[in-house]
Amino acid sequence: VIKADIALHDLSLAPSWRNGSVVVGHSRITPYAHRMLESCLVVTTDRWFLVVRERQSGTAGLAAPAGEPRAPRHVDEEAFHYLYQACVLWPLDYLMVEVARVGCRLRIRAGMLGSAPVYARATNDRITVSWDSADFAALPMALDTEVVTHRLAMHTMYAARQPYSGVTMLTERASLYVEPGKANLRYPDPVAASAPRDDRDGDDDLPAFEAALRRSAAARPVGEHATVELSGGMDSATVATVLRSLGTTLASRGILLDGEVRDTQVPRRSLIVDRLGLADATVDIAAWPPDLDMAPAGAQGFYREFYLEACMALWSSARSEGRDTLFTGVGGDELFPAYAGEGMPGAAMDPGWVGESATCAEGLLTPRAREAARSLRTFDAPAGPVPMTSLIANSCRAPDMLRHGQWPVAPLGDPQLVAFCHRLPRASRRGRELMRRYLASHLGADVFPPGYSKETFAHVLPPLIARHALSLTAQLTQCALADIGLVEPRAVLALLDTVVRTQSHGATSALANFLWLERFARQTA
C-alpha cells in the first residue's frame, strides 16, 4: 500500500510530510490514497516509523486518511514504544516502514492479511517499493528461472521470491531489513495446523458462525461506498447477506456467463439481489472476453486476473457511482477443508481436472526445466493465519483493483473466522453445510438447495482460444520462454491444437497459464 524510492543515505535525515508523501532528503514514500486506509508518521530521537493501515470501526484517530497531509507526531521514547506496539498488533492489514537514522537502517513489516502486498528491490544504496509489480518492468530485469519454472508447472506457490530476480514480495507477517550494502528478508514463525473437534450431540454451530461472520464484516467503517462482487455462488452471497444484515447500503456487481451455467446463474443472482435489496449491475463475459494478444499495451505485473477485462468494466461502473470499497468472496473455498481420511464431496476442484492440467503443463517443459520443476522448493512462506490460496488470490487481484480505485476486502479470509471454521466437526464442513444453512435462514432454502450447480468460468476460454488459434499460432513463432530453455515450442503448439480439438478444461488451464507467463517474459527479452 505504498510506493517508495529511497536512497539509503537519505535516511540519516529527518522526515516530513509533503503533498501526500513522506519526504526524506530526495527520497519519497507515498501511501496509497483511499478512504479505507489511514497513515501516521511517528518520530522520536534518531528513529521514526510510518504506518499505513486499514481503518478499524470504532477506533479513535491516531492516523489521518492515507494520502492526506498530517504533521509528523513527535513523541518521547516511551510514547514511541507504545505507539509502535499498538501498530504491530493492529488487527486489520497494515504496512510499516521503520527507520533508524544512525546507520541508515530500514525495516518494512507487513500485516497478516496479505490484502495488497508490496514488492521491493534493494541495491547497495537504494530501495524501490511498490504495490504494483508492473512498475519494475521499466528496469532491465532478469527472470528468476526457478520461480518461472514452478509457475509453468502450475505449482501452488506463495513466497517472497518472484519471477524477477532480486524483486521480493513482502508476504504476510514478513519483514525486510535493509541497510547500505545489505538486505535480508525474514519470514515469521508458522501458524500451527488446525484440527477438527469431535461431533457433540445437540451442538448447533450456526449462531457462532453467524457471530464470527458479523464481527469480520463489521470490522471496517464501510459507509455508503461499498460494492460486493456477486457471482451467484455461496461465497459472495454470504458476504452480501452479512453486510446487509448489518444495515450496510450495498451495491452488487457481477459477470454473467454464457452457456448452460447461465440458465442457473441468472435466476439465482436475481433471487439474491431481490431478497437483499441490492443496487445491481452486470456485464456479459461475451462482451468483455479475455485479451489473448501476446503484445498488450502497457507493462505487465507478476500476476493477472484472467478475466480482467470484464472485471475492469465492473470496477469502473462502481467507481463512477463513488463506490470504492469492493467486498469479495475470496477465502470461501478455504473455510471448510477436508482433513486426511475424510471423504468430502463437493470439493472446489475435481482432482481429475487438476491432474490433467498438471500433466499438460509439465508436457510443455524442456528436460532440464522439468527436473527443476520436480525439485522441492525451500523458499516458500510458512503457513499463516490466512490460507495460502486466499493470499495468492489477493496478490493476483489487488494491483488491478487498486489501479481502478477499489480497496479489496475479503471477510471470509478473516483469521478468526478461518480458525473457527477449520475446527468445525465434519458434519458442519461437509458440503459447506453450515454456510448453506446460514444462507437458507436469510435468503430462503430455494436459493442454494443441497447439490446446487455452481457457476464456473471453465467454459469461457476454450472457445475463445479456438477462435483465435491462427493468430496465437502466428504470435508463438517466437517464444521468449523457449529462448531461455524452459519450454519446447512444438509442445506449445501441440497443446494449442489439443485445446482447439477437445476444448478440454485441463488443457485450456495449462495453456492459459503458459500464455500469461509468455506475455510477461517478453518484457525481459
Regions found by a protein language model. Give the residues of each.
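Cysteine-centered catalytic environments shared across enzyme families
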Residues: 1-288, 515
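Alpha-helix initiation and N-capping motif
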Residues: 11, 76-80, 133, 145-146, ...
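Short, solvent-exposed polar/charged micro-motifs at secondary-structure junctions
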Residues: 38-39, 197, 290-295, 458-465
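Residues that form generic nucleotide/phosphate-binding pockets
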Residues: 78, 82-86, 139, 151, ...
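ATP-dependent adenylate-handling active sites, centered on carboxylate activation for C-N bond formation
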Residues: 102-105, 112, 123, 180, ...
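Short, conserved sequence motifs enriched in acidic/basic residues, glycine, and aromatics
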Residues: 142, 411-412, 486
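Short coil/turn segments at secondary-structure boundaries
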Residues: 161-171, 220, 226-227, 403-405, ...
